[in-house]
Amino acid sequence: MKAAVYDVEGAPGVLKYVDVPDPVAGPDEILISVEAISIEGGDLINRRSTPPPLPSWIVGYAAAGTVVAVGSKVRNRRVGDRVTAFSMQGSHAERWAVPEERNWLIPDGVDMAEAAAVPISFATAHHCLFTRGMLRNGETVLIQAAAGGVGLAAVQLASQAGATVIAVASGTERISSLHELGADYVVDRAKNNVVGSVRQYTHGTGIDFVIDPVGTMLPASLSALASEGRLVFVGNAGGGNLTVDLWPPMQSNQTLMGVFMGPLFERPGVRTSVDNMLQAVAPGRIRVVIDRIFPLANAAAAHEYAETAKPLGRIVMKP
C-alpha cells in the first residue's frame, strides 16, 4: 500500500509518499480501507518534533473508511461497515489497523471527510466544555484558536448549551464564519488585544470559562479569566514553553485543568459523545468545517498548508 512516512522529525518536507507493507488486523482489531484522513494538530507536532520510533513511520491519528477485515475476537464490526477511527499513529495510509474500541459506525448521510474530522475535534470540545469544564447555561466562555477544529466544535457546542461565546481568531472570513456558527463576539487577535477586548466586553469581570488549545496563550487566557473561573488547556499547538506564574490564579481562586484525549477514547462516556456527534451531522445540528482536501500523495503540501495557511477548520487527505 501507499503511505506518507517519515524517517526523521522536521518540516513538512520530511514526509515521503512510498510503498510500505499492508497492515494486518490483530485479534482485537479491524482493518480499514482508508477513504479520508483528517490532519490533526498532534500529527503536525509529532512530525515536527518527535523522533520516529521505527523507520518509515506512518504518522496520523484520525481517518475514516470501510472495514475490509476483522480480527478473531472482534464482535461488533463486520466487513463492509463504514467507520471513523482514532489511534495514536498510522492514519496517513491507504489501509489502517485500529482497535475495535477506537472506531465508530458512520451514520447514513455523513460523508467520509466529515466523519474523519468528528472524533477528535468534537469529542475533545465536548469533554473540555462539559465533562471537565462543567459549563452551565448563561456562563461566558472564551475559545482561543476558535478557527481550528476543536475551536469550531467548541463554539457550536457552547452556543447550543446557552453560553455566551467569545471566540478568538483573525481574518474577515474566519470571523464571519464564527458568527454564523454561534459566536456572540469575535476578537480579531491581529488587530486587538485579547485580554483588553474581553475585559471591555464583560465590563471588567472577566470570563467564566476558557478553552485554550494553543498553550502559548495561557498567560493571556488566565488574565482574561474571572475570579473563580475555570480554564482547560488542551494541547500545545503553539509549540512553545508552557511555563506560567500560578500565584495570581491561586489568589483569584481560579481552576486550571489539563486535557489529553489520547487515553480517553475508550471510556464509555467519550465513546457515546462521539456517537452522538456523528448522529448530529446529517440533520445539520453540528457543522463539520473542512477547509481543503488534498491527495495523500501530497501529504507534505497538506501539512505545510495546515501549518502556514491559517485554515478554517480541518484539512483532509484522500488516498
Q: What are the residue ranges of the model-derived segments?
A:
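Glycine-rich beta-strand-centered segment in the early N-terminal region that forms part
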Residues: 21-38, 49-90
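Short glycine-centered segments of the SAM/dcSAM-binding site in methyltransferase folds
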Residues: 82, 140, 164, 229-230, ...
